[in-house]
Amino acid sequence: MAPKKKVVGLIKLQIQAGQANPAPPVGPALGQHGVNIMEFCKAYNAATENQRGQVIPVEITVYEDRSFTFALKTPPAAKLLLKAAGVGKGSAEPHKNKVAKVSWDQVKEIAETKKADLNANDIDAAAKIIAGTARSMGITVE
């Protein structure tokens, strides 16, 4: 069995799917850990090619020998809610001004998508987490 590589850094980024490039914020974040930036960009773009138009969070683990691995996460709940509600951004005063409405079916659908990344035991608990996010953005859940 090969010896374990020593982890020297963990980088979390949110990048548009299929659009990673060496410009900020990607380049500086990876450069300070000595990672080959173009190699990461090519791998990330290939992995997210089918999800274009969405923001995909990525967790990059950097090892002592400057190699890396990365794990893709599901898109942020806020972005999925904005897309479902059909609005550009949430309310500046969420408890006073409501900007949109989403149905419980839409919330459950988003919860299904996010289930892997949420700390919930079942879909109903995940849906409540998503509904809380919606409420804090000024989106009404019906």
Swiss-Prot record:
UniProt cross-references to InterPro entries, sorted A to Z: Ribosomal_uL11 (IPR000911), Ribosomal_uL11_bac-typ (IPR006519), Ribosomal_uL11_C (IPR020783), Ribosomal_uL11_C_sf (IPR036769), Ribosomal_uL11_CS (IPR020785), Ribosomal_uL11_N (IPR020784), Ribosomal_uL11_N_sf (IPR036796)
Pfam families in UniProt: Ribosomal_L11, Ribosomal_L11_N
Gene Ontology terms describing biological process: translation
Any one GO cellular component localisation term in the record: cytosolic large ribosomal subunit
PTM (free text): One or more lysine residues are methylated.
Gene Ontology MF terms: large ribosomal subunit rRNA binding; structural constituent of ribosome
Statement: the UniProt record of this protein carries the keyword RNA-binding: yes
Superkingdom of this protein's organism: Bacteria
UniProt keyword annotations, A-Z: Methylation, Ribonucleoprotein, Ribosomal protein, RNA-binding, rRNA-binding
Tagged with keyword Coiled coil: no
Record-stated family: Belongs to the universal ribosomal protein uL11 family.
Subunit structure: Part of the ribosomal stalk of the 50S ribosomal subunit. Interacts with L10 and the large rRNA to form the base of the stalk. L10 forms an elongated spine to which L12 dimers bind in a sequential fashion forming a multimeric L10(L12)X complex.
Record's function text: Forms part of the ribosomal stalk which helps the ribosome interact with GTP-bound translation factors.
Protein name: Large ribosomal subunit protein uL11
Organism, as annotated: Mycolicibacterium paratuberculosis (strain ATCC BAA-968 / K-10)
